[in-house]
Regions:
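Conserved SAM-binding loop of SAM-dependent methyltransferases across substrates and taxa
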Residues: 3-15
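Conserved S-adenosyl-L-methionine
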Residues: 12-19, 84
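Conserved SAM/SAH-binding beta-strand->alpha-helix loop
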Residues: 24-27
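S-adenosyl-L-methionine
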Residues: 32-54
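A short SAM/SAH-binding and catalytic strip from SAM-dependent methyltransferases
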Residues: 57-71
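A short, conserved alpha-helix within the catalytic core of class I
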Residues: 68-80
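Conserved beta-strand signature within the Rossmann-like core of class I S-adenosyl-L-methionine
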Residues: 84-95
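Core SAM-dependent methyltransferase catalytic element
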Residues: 114-134
Length: 134
């Protein structure tokens, strides 16, 4: 989500047919306004709820998943993450929340976790997490 900068950057680097952004409605309006200033080759979809998508090539989540409540995490995992071939995530919540997610993901994905930074109190660490569908 954010302001739409990742969508614009990916559009400059590669072709895509569809790009789906999950975010709150006010953020979606900002993204639409920002992206309207550029020629985006693929179709951009904005979702405020984790609607089910199938056959996702790549999912990128920079902090968003770890900032959702448990109910939304469940919906997002079951409707979006599990239907992705590859997932790249930055997780920034405490160890318990991260471990719950990783244990869940291990049944569906090959999981790689790399600790990047040791500076984020009270969470302690910042992690890059890569998932590849089994």
């Amino acid at each position: 989500g954010g302001y739409g900068g990742l969508c614009k950057t990916i559009n400059c680097l590669c072709d895509f047919g569809e790009y789906h952004i999950y975010d709150m409605e006010p953020a979606s309006r900002l993204q639409e306004k920002y992206l309207s200033n550029f020629k985006i080759d693929g179709k951009v979809f904005h979702h405020s709820e984790p609607e089910e998508l199938k056959d996702i090539d790549l999912l990128i989540s920079n902090y968003a998943y770890s900032e959702l409540g448990e109910k939304l995490q469940d919906l997002y995992y079951n409707n979006v993450i599990v239907n992705s071939k590859k997932v790249y995530m930055i997780l920034n919540r405490g160890q318990v929340s991260r471990e719950v997610f990783l244990k869940r993901a291990e049944k569906d994905f090959e999981v790689t976790v790399e600790k990047v930074l040791d500076f984020w109190p009270p969470n302690g660490h910042l992690y890059y997490t890569t998932l590849i569908r089994k």
